[in-house]
Amino acid sequence: MSDQPHTLRYLANCSMLFTEEPLLERPRAAAAAGFTAIEFWWPWPDNPTPSQEEIDAFVTAVDDSGVQLVGLNFFAGELTGPVDAGVLSIPARSQQFRDNIPVAVGIGERLGVQAFNALYGVRVDDSTPQEQDALALENLGLAAEAAARIGATVLVEPVSGPKPYALRTAADTIAVVDAVRAAGHDNVGFLNDLFHLANNGDDPAAAVAAHTDKTAHVQIADYPGRGEPGTGELDLDALLAQLQEQGYDGYVGLEYKPTTTTTDSLAWLPTARRA
């Protein structure tokens, strides 16, 4: 990547980066690396409603580090396992998502979270796509109502990989964003994950051109491989410059799998450009 083709701010996804450290030490590690802003997947992948003690420990770890928690996932199951990729569209697990909403938003209220990522989930055999989509619309509406109370946004993203995730393209995802907005929830936006789009064969540049006005957050990793920028073939500089030219001024989440240590994988990014 070149020196500075754009001025967008980068933040560290502490569920993918700094995994050399225990989860509660990662905010401090991100701060030591020069970041002032971070994001996390849901910290308890097996539990949508952790104990107050667990919640307080997480909040304290972020507070004490001095970094801003900008983004947090709602409960989505075990994302690194073979099955889970969100629960909000799955009838048998919908209640887990609903139970998680006030917990996640409560953490967000304490830490100033600006955006909550709501992973849609996979297609299941015991429900039709239409039934799943209707349930998802209802649950995303509930999430948006709760997030709105603290001035936050709900994000919806495409996901790639072998799991039968329902939203594969930018068009798939924008259709959901539009449906939730049409139901009266304006605080729902597109999470443009440039890696997932490329990995699914969607055109990231076309998605930027068509959907920047509905883009509420951006995440990057290089393609192929999902490594740090410079390890693949995506022209991330050009894509991010295009986003900024079209009016995007939010954060860029670094959600990649380091091919070396996290610190060494950040060599491409001068400390001064870390959010």
Regions found by a protein language model. Name each.
Residues 40-45, 69-73, 100-104, 145-150, ...:
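Short C-terminal domain-edge/linker segments immediately following a structured domain
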